[in-house]
Amino acid sequence: MPELTHFDAAGQAHMVDVGGKQETRRIAIARGSIRMLPETFALIRDGNAKKGDVIGIARIAAIQGSKRTADLIPLCHPLALTRVKVDFELDDTLPGVHCTVQVETLGRTGVEMEALTAVQVGLLTVYDMCKAVDRGMTITDVRVLEKHGGKSGDWVAG
């Protein structure tokens, strides 16, 4: 079983030293969903939410979230991201919204945390903008779908 890299031999938390690693192209794709009442879904779909363009604002929030990951997750390295692509898919069968984020960098450590943070912040923004009409919304199934680059190579969720 692989070791936990954020702890030293004495069990103390530390930021991993990535100084000796090769810079490679790193890509991570994460996805999550938010379930809601059909009426809430209709407000988003039809562009009638009182706070404005829910998906447009959530997209900007997701991008901002990816860029602020190191400020939120204590042992994450601050990274110079080269690309953040955010897609929202309206799904009337949930009913709800799926958020998929692809994050890229040229660096020494992966961008999985940035992709996960972006998804969460995007979905939290949907919740924030619609909570006045639906406090029962549920954020669910947030996970990494793919990771590419680095020493460990490619990984795709099964």
UniProtKB/Swiss-Prot annotation:
Keyword Cell membrane annotated: no
Biological process per Gene Ontology, one example term: Mo-molybdopterin cofactor biosynthetic process
The entry's keywords: Lyase, Molybdenum cofactor biosynthesis
Enzyme class: lyase
One Gene Ontology MF term: cyclic pyranopterin monophosphate synthase activity
Catalysed transformations (reactions): (8S)-3',8-cyclo-7,8-dihydroguanosine 5'-triphosphate = cyclic pyranopterin phosphate + diphosphate
Entries under CDD domains matching the protein: MoaC_PE
Superkingdom as given in the UniProt entry: Bacteria
Protein role: Catalyzes the conversion of (8S)-3',8-cyclo-7,8-dihydroguanosine 5'-triphosphate to cyclic pyranopterin monophosphate (cPMP).
Stated name of the protein: Cyclic pyranopterin monophosphate synthase
Provenance organism: Paraburkholderia phytofirmans (strain DSM 17436 / LMG 22146 / PsJN) (Burkholderia phytofirmans)
Lineage: Bacteria, Pseudomonadati, Pseudomonadota, Betaproteobacteria, Burkholderiales
